[in-house]
């Protein structure tokens, strides 16, 4: 079973086999999911391409940006827990980054709590596969830096809500029964990367700082996707991530 997948024995190969010696260029990295935000970063900030995540279906360039005097790595992440978690491992090797700021959109399970607020996850339900290779089995994984992120949002006087979230691999299998079960357990949003990326960071001793903006709404009589584009691409998330980078 997938829940038996955690095995801390020696690996057969690793990042060095694909990329050579590790680079040490910066400590902080932004995990970007929005193509529009990433294009804005490339247009706005001085940057240098320092490597690339390479696979048979394409190349993902990795950059180090100069943002307000800080050296911050950044790249356009693949979607989904397994791919996003693999990207983090590769980018650590290519840049030396050990502090990852990840932000993106989510679906709201409780619009009364999330509307008009940033969501700061405290735990994530592990309905994906990657986390079980990097952490012992459990229903939830703790998002360890939630209190740190919360303190930064409060300092910046940004509206926010703490809560559990649900990480799924199956975007078209968010069913009514699962919705009800997760909401009963206290989940307020659903997304596709956090549990796996948090497990990877915990395994290697790296830090993850995550926040979300809800776009589509699942707790209404009719599924509402009207806010998703803004949740994906609004630049306010980038500016918040920069403020987090200043403080970690």
Describe each model-derived feature in a short phrase.
Residues 148-156, 200, 240-248:
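Generic non-transmembrane alpha-helical segments
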Residues 195-230:
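Zn-dependent metallopeptidase/amidohydrolase metal-coordination segment
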Residues 218-248:
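His/Asp/Glu-rich mid-to-C-terminal helical/loop segments that flank catalytic regions of hydrolases
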Residues 50-54, 158-163, 248:
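Flexible, glycine/charged-enriched surface loops at secondary-structure junctions
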Residues 139-184:
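Active-site rim beta-loop-alpha module in soluble metabolic enzymes
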Residues 1-143, 147-148, 203:
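Metabolite-binding pocket within alpha/beta catalytic cores that recognizes anionic/polar moieties
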Residues 187-189:
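Short pre-catalytic strand/loop immediately N-terminal to key active-site residues, enriched for Gly-Thr
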């Amino acid at each position: 079973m997938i829940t038996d997948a955690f095995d801390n024995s020696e690996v057969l190969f690793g990042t060095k086999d694909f990329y050579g010696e590790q680079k040490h260029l910066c400590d902080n990295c932004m995990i970007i999911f929005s193509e529009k935000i990433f294009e804005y970063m490339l247009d706005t900030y001085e940057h240098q391409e320092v490597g690339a995540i390479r696979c048979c279906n394409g190349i993902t360039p990795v950059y180090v940006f100069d943002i307000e005097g800080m050296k911050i790595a950044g790249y356009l992440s693949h979607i989904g827990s397994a791919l996003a978690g693999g990207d983090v491992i590769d980018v650590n090797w290519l840049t030396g980054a050990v502090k990852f700021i990840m932000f993106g959109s989510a679906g709201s399970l409780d619009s009364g709590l999330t509307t008009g607020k940033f969501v700061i996850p405290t735990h994530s339900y592990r309905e994906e596969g990657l986390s079980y290779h990097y952490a012992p089995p459990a229903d939830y994984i703790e998002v360890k830096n939630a209190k740190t992120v919360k303190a930064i949002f409060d300092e910046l006087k940004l509206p926010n809500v703490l809560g559990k979230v649900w990480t799924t691999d199956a975007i078209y299998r968010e069913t009514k029964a699962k919705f009800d079960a997760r909401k009963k357990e206290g989940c307020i949003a659903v997304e596709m990367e956090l549990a796996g990326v948090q497990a990877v960071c915990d395994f290697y001793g790296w830090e993850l700082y995550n926040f979300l903006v809800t776009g589509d709404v699942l707790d209404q009589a009719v599924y509402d996707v009207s806010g998703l584009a803004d949740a994906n691409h609004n630049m306010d998330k980038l500016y918040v991530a920069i403020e987090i980078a200043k403080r970690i």
